[in-house]
């Protein structure tokens, strides 16, 4: 009886953990909010003044890309954090 209860609890905990990981909601990020979330995702900090990130943002902004950019993927339509992470260090 005890083994059955422990197995049941274990199955419930594992299924709750798995379902919470799968339910990341795609959101839209535009303007300052997009800049802040990118700074947080890429550098692990909240962006305040932005001066310390100027070279990064200028380089990213000035680089011409033929494929869709972060604004296309995360402002014009919802995206998940994994998509934002793919723009770190670009």
Curated annotation (Swiss-Prot):
Propeptide: 49-64
One Pfam entry name: Insulin
Disulfide bonds: 30-75, 42-88, 74-79
Subcellular location: Secreted
Single annotated GO MF: insulin-like growth factor receptor binding
GO BP annotations listed: cell population proliferation; insulin-like growth factor receptor signaling pathway; negative regulation of apoptotic process; positive regulation of cell population proliferation; positive regulation of phosphatidylinositol 3-kinase/protein kinase B signal transduction
CDD domains found in the cross-reference section: IlGF_insulin_bombyxin_like
Keyword Mitochondrion among record annotations: no
Entry keyword set: Cleavage on pair of basic residues, Disulfide bond, Hormone, Secreted, Signal
GO annotation, cellular component aspect: extracellular space
Signal peptide: 1-20
Presence of keyword Secreted: yes
Function: Brain peptide responsible for activation of prothoracic glands to produce ecdysone in insects.
Quaternary context: Heterodimer of a B chain and an A chain linked by two disulfide bonds.
Miscellaneous note of the record: Silk worm has two kinds of PTTH: 4K-PTTH and 22K-PTTH; there are many forms of 4K-PTTH.
Family: Belongs to the insulin family.
The protein's name in its UniProt record: Bombyxin B-9
Organism: Bombyx mori
């Amino acid at each position: 009886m005890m083994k059955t209860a422990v197995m049941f609890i274990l199955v419930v905990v594992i299924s709750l953990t798995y379902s919470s990981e799968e339910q990341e909601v795609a959101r839209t990020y535009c303007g300052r909010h997009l800049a802040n979330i990118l700074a947080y995702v890429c550098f692990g900090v909240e962006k305040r003044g932005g001066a310390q990130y100027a070279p990064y943002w200028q380089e990213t902004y000035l680089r011409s890309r033929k494929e869709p950019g972060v604004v296309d993927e995360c402002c014009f339509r919802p995206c998940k954090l994994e998509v934002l992470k793919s723009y770190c260090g670009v």
